[in-house]
C-alpha cells in the first residue's frame, strides 16, 4: 500500500481528522539510521506523528519539531516536519532494544522512559518559536501526544500510531491518525468515537490487510458523514546542505573553531537526520574563521 495522508471532517465539522499510511516513509528513516526493532518502532511512531502534525502548519516555510526525552536508553527522539508532509528525524540510540512488553508488543515506552517531557515546537518565522511542553504520560508516544493536545491546546484528541517491524527489520506497515473534537461538539459523539476506537483492530493490522487510509477512516466513522478534504503523499526527506552544515560549524564559536583550525586537520560533520558526512579541509576551516569572525 502506497503512503498517503488525508485530512477529513465528520459529523458536519464536529470532528477533525488527519490520517496516514506511512510505511515507506518510516522504512526510509529506519534504514537510514540502521535501527534495532524497538528503536524502529519508536522512531517510526514519531515520524508518523510528525507527518500528521506538520500538515497543520499554515506556511511552507514553517516547521514543527517534536522531541521526546524520557531518560531511557533511546536517548531521545527528534522529528522535524513541514506543511507539505515531508519529515525527517533521528533517535539518539538507534540500537536501543529490549524484550517485548507484557502484551508481546515492542516496548517503546521501555526505551523512551517516563522521566522527562514531550515538546512540540512550532517555528513560524517569528522572533521566538512557540513551544508547548508536557510531562511524558506513558512513553508510548501516541498517548503522550493525546495528553499534550488535551492539556496544552485544550483540544480533546485521540492519537493512534502504529509501526509493525518485520523479521528482516524492514517495516511491514506503519500509519496513524489524529482525531479531534471541535469546540461545541456533541459529548455523546465523543463517547461513541472513543468506543469505536477501542473496538477496532490496530492501524497496522488494517494496513497489513490492504486497507487504504480512506477505507480505514470510513470504517471508524461509518454513518458519520466522513468528508475527505485533501490528500498528499508524505515522505522522508532531509534538506541538509553543505551551507547549512558550514553555518552549524561556525556556530560552535570563535574559540572552539580556532582550536580546530590550529590542529591543522580536516573536520568531518554528519547530519543527524540522514547521516550524510560533510568534510571541511584545514583551509576551508580557515576560510570559515575569516568569513564569520575576521580571523585566521
Curated annotation (Swiss-Prot):
Which range is the signal sequence, renumbered to this chain?
none
Question: Pfam families, from UniProt?
Answer: HSP33 (PF01430)
Superkingdom as given in the UniProt entry: Bacteria
- Biological process annotations from GO: protein refolding
Biological role: Redox regulated molecular chaperone. Protects both thermally unfolding and oxidatively damaged proteins from irreversible aggregation. Plays an important role in the bacterial defense system toward oxidative stress.
Give the UniProt family note: Belongs to the HSP33 family.
- What's this protein's name? 33 kDa chaperonin
Organism of derivation = Clostridium botulinum (strain 657 / Type Ba4)
Q: Which gene encodes it?
A: hslO
Amino acid at each position: 500500500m502506497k503512503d498517503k495522508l488525508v485530512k477529513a471532517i465528520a459529523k458536519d465539522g464536529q470532528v477533525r481528522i488527519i490520517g496516514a499510511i506511512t510505511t515507506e516513509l518510516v522504512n526510509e528513516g529506519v534504514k537510514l539510521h540502521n535501527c534495532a526493532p524497538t528503536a524502529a518502532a519508536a522512531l517510526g511512531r514519531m515520524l508518523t506523528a510528525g507527518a500528521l502534525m506538520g500538515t497543520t502548519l499554515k506556511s511552507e516555510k514553517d516547521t514543527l519539531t517534536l522531541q521526546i526525552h524520557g531518560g531511557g536508553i533511546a536517548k531521545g527522539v527528534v522529528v522535524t516536519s513541514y506543511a507539505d508532509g515531508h519529515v525527517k528525524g533521528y533517535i539518539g540510540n538507534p540500537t536501543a532494544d529490549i524484550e517485548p512488553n507484557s502484551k508481546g508488543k515492542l516496548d517503546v515506552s521501555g526505551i523512551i522512559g517516563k522521566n522527562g517531557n514531550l515538546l512540540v515546537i512550532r517555528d513560524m518565522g517569528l522572533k521566538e518559536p512557540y513551544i508547548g511542553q508536557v510531562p511524558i504520560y506513558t512513553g508510548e508516544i501516541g498517548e503522550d501526544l493525546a495528553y499534550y493536545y488535551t492539556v496544552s491546546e485544550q483540544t480533546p484528541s485521540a492519537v493512534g500510531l502504529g509501526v509493525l517491524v518485520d523479521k528482516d527489520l524492514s517495516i511491514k506497515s506503519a500509519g496513524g491518525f489524529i482525531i479531534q473534537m471541535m469546540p461545541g461538539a456533541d459529548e455523546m459523539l465523543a463517547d461513541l468515537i472513543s468506543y469505536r476506537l477501542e473496538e477496532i483492530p490496530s492501524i497496522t493490522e488494517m494496513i497489513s490487510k490492504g486497507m487504504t487510509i480512506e477505507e480505514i477512516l470510513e470504517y471508524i466513522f461509518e454513518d458519520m458523514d466522513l468528508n475527505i478534504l485533501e490528500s498528499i503523499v508524505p515522505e522522508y526527506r532531509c534538506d541538509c546542505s553543505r551551507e547549512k552544515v558550514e553555518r552549524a560549524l561556525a556556530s560552535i564559536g570563535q574559540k572552539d573553531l580556532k582550536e580546530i583550525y590550529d590542529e591543522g586537520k580536516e573536520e568531518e560533520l554528519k547530519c543527524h537526520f540522514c547521516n550524510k558526512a560533510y568534510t571541511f579541509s584545514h583551509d576551508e576551516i580557515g576560510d570559515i574563521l575569516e568569513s564569520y569572525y575576521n580571523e585566521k
